[in-house]
From Swiss-Prot:
GO biological process: iron-sulfur cluster assembly
Domain of life: Bacteria
Gene name linked to the record: cyaY
InterPro entries xrefs: CyaY, Frataxin/CyaY, Frataxin/CyaY_sf, Frataxin_CS
Lineage: Bacteria, Pseudomonadati, Pseudomonadota, Gammaproteobacteria, Enterobacterales
Protein name (Swiss-Prot/TrEMBL): Iron-sulfur cluster assembly protein CyaY
A cellular-component GO term for this protein: cytosol
Function: Involved in iron-sulfur (Fe-S) cluster assembly. May act as a regulator of Fe-S biogenesis.
Family of the protein in this entry: Belongs to the frataxin family.
Keyword Metal-binding: yes
GO molecular function (one): ferrous iron binding
Keyword line: Iron, Metal-binding
Entry keyword Iron: yes
SUPFAM superfamilies: Frataxin/Nqo15-like
Length: 106
């Protein structure tokens, strides 16, 4: 994958997250902000989830209260380089815990 392909895929990931949050109908408020390629989800309790792109490594990084995760693209899916879990699974787990209610991005 070259840099432009990586940015296209990361942009698509960011857009999907934004669209899902725009349609969010849960009780808790989740704010989404993008600044310089970093996507920040802010929760009512003051906690945050930070998602950023690591262009030199062609990875997406996810920082949550539970820890940090690095994702590589494998077969059109962002997969954690340590656990093998998908980006969406780990994001939903963290967002659900930090929001205090079930959050789905799919």
């Amino acid at each position: 994958m070259n840099d432009s392909e990586f940015h296209r895929l990361a942009d698509a990931l960011w857009l999907t997250i934004e669209e899902r949050l725009d349609n969010w109908d849960g009780d808790s408020d989740i704010d989404c902000e993008i600044n310089g390629g970093v996507l920040t989800l802010s929760f009512e309790n003051g906690s945050k989830i930070i998602i950023n792109r690591q262009e030199p490594l062609h990875q997406v990084w996810l920082a949550t209260k539970q820890g940090g995760y690095h994702f590589d693209l494998k077969d059109d899916e962002w997969v954690c380089d340590r656990s093998g879990e998908t980006f969406w699974d780990l994001l939903e787990q963290a967002a659900t815990q930090q929001a205090g209610e079930k959050v789905s991005f799919r």
